[in-house]
Curated annotation (Swiss-Prot):
InterPro entries tied to this protein: aa-tRNA-synth_II/BPL/LPL, Gly-tRNA-synth_heterodimer, Gly-tRNA_ligase_asu
Reaction catalyzed: tRNA(Gly) + glycine + ATP = glycyl-tRNA(Gly) + AMP + diphosphate
Phylogenetic lineage: Bacteria, Bacillati, Bacillota, Bacilli, Lactobacillales
One GO cellular component term: cytosol
Name of the protein described by the UniProt record: Glycine--tRNA ligase alpha subunit
HAMAP family found in the cross-reference section: Gly_tRNA_synth_alpha
Chain's gene name: glyQ
Keyword Cytoplasm carried by entry: yes
Length: 305
């Protein structure tokens, strides 16, 4: 590889590439979440009959993975570049390999493997066929064809490509520690993020008030239910995300037992399923506006029978 791209140049390159493939460039969703999949731009849009092609960077928080900024590869918060395409293009894997070439990674010169790794997210009732993508022995991407989201079968099938930006940047820049990644010319990743990593880790493992978090979970769950009673999908889903992050904080603090853990996950999943069903009903009521006219009329006629 000749020029070593900065972290932000990697993002810009991927944005331009997937824009050229017809993806809308969305912005990171403004609620804490553990993965880009949990953004409404993936979770909600992967269900129902309407097409959807989007790409976006998603900061992803995983409190239990915090290491006070001392581990070169484990982070409280990392960044994913998320691509969702529905229906899935038949050449999605070829497009992905082409995107690596744009980053200066020639597939013919490197060991790139698709390793089967079917995906499941119990807290949202989602699952799919999947592969990890390994570049010279390091996982850099997760590929998933969604089969179920929010407890609902998907159709048409949505393809999801999730790049781990820190891992990709570490490889491209040939650095061993994420904190040595060059974010922009002259600015290191650690100069931006190592202090937040330390503080969030300290809060998650030492400072957070378990009683307040438990109360918050109950309140967020209740508010999600109230929003759903009024058919308000998006406010309800915001509270599902808040429940999920609050649970992750409780889990990091060691505040939930194995039995309680399953119960909390089930509570989040039940809410996510109702959100998914309500969203599909809402899109139908709106007349599936993203469908082409012929398909829309046909589908609405079939639904009316």
């Amino acid at each position: 590889m000749s020029k070593k791209l900065t972290f932000q140049e990697i993002i810009l390159t991927l944005q331009q590439f997937w824009n050229d493939q017809g993806c809308m460039l969305m912005q990171a969703y403004d609620n804490e979440k553990g993965a880009g999949t949990m953004s409404p731009y993936t979770f909600l849009r992967a269900i129902g009959p309407e097409p959807w092609n989007a790409a976006y960077v998603e900061p992803s928080r995983r409190p239990a993975d915090g290491r006070y900024g001392e581990n070169p590869n484990r982070l409280y918060q990392h960044h994913q570049f998320q691509v969702v395409m529905k229906p899935s293009p038949s050449n999605i894997q070829e497009l992905y390999l082409e995107s690596l070439e744009k980053l200066g990674i020639n597939p013919l010169e490197h060991d790139i493997r698709f390793v089967e790794d079917n995906w499941e997210n119990p807290s949202t009732g989602s699952a799919g066929l999947g592969w990890e993508v390994w570049l010279d022995g390091m996982e850099i991407t997760q590929f998933t064809y969604f089969q179920q989201v929010g407890g609902l079968a998907t159709g048409p099938v949505t393809a999801e490509v999730t790049y781990g930006l820190e891992r990709l940047a570490s490889y491209i820049q040939e650095v061993d520690s994420v904190y040595d990644i060059e974010w922009a010319d002259g600015v290191k990743y650690g100069e931006i993020f190592i202090q937040p990593e330390y503080e969030h880790s300290k809060y998650s493992f030492e400072i957070s008030d378990q009683e307040i978090l438990l109360e918050n979970f109950d309140k967020f769950e209740k508010e999600a239910g109230r929003a759903l009673e009024e058919g308000l999908v998006h406010p309800a889903y915001d509270y599902v995300l808040k429940c999920s992050h609050t649970f992750n904080l409780l889990d990091a603090r060691g505040a939930v037992s194995v039995t309680e853990r399953a119960g909390y996950i089930a509570r989040i999943r039940n809410l996510a399923r109702v959100v998914a069903k309500t969203f599909v009903a809402e899109r139908k009521r709106l007349g599936y506006p993203l469908l082409d006219e012929e398909t829309r009329v046909k589908l609405l006629a079939e639904d009316a029978e």
